[in-house]
Amino acid sequence: MSRRTLSLTLAAVVLLGDRVTKVWIESHLSFSDTIPVIPGVFNIVHTQNRGMAFGLFSNGASASRNLLLAAVALVVLLFVAGLIWRLPPQAPRGQRFTPAALGLILGGALGNLYDRLLKGSVTDFLDLHAGSLHWPAFNIADSAITIGAVLLALELLRPAHRD
């Protein structure tokens, strides 16, 4: 499988997983319902996020915020798609995870952009707690974007191996 095909396949899997889970949440839970999975640690919830990943930029005028966030997502999509298109057939030294990372980011960005364009908000449902600490609810797309960004950062920070 080519590196480009790997990226695009992973993006499609992330997009499909994101859509399936969001549709399930929207059809089985009323807004703000909670299902405790691990009490005090992990819940499944139904929330709508009008901002970015993890609730960032959720304040502000609705129309201008949605336009700005959709534009940012579109720029990210085009940039990542361009990087995928330019992937060399063989992995350059130190770039083993780049196709997977780009696929995760592309799939996650597509998933959240789909919600934002159709509904003006993104469905979030994964809710983590650690004692009194509470992480904002997130979804599969947010997770994929975060994991992809971490993989890219690790590849950039990892020293090149010498033969």
How should each PLM-predicted stretch be described?
Residues 1-163:
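Alpha-helical transmembrane bundles and membrane-interface segments of multipass inner-membrane proteins
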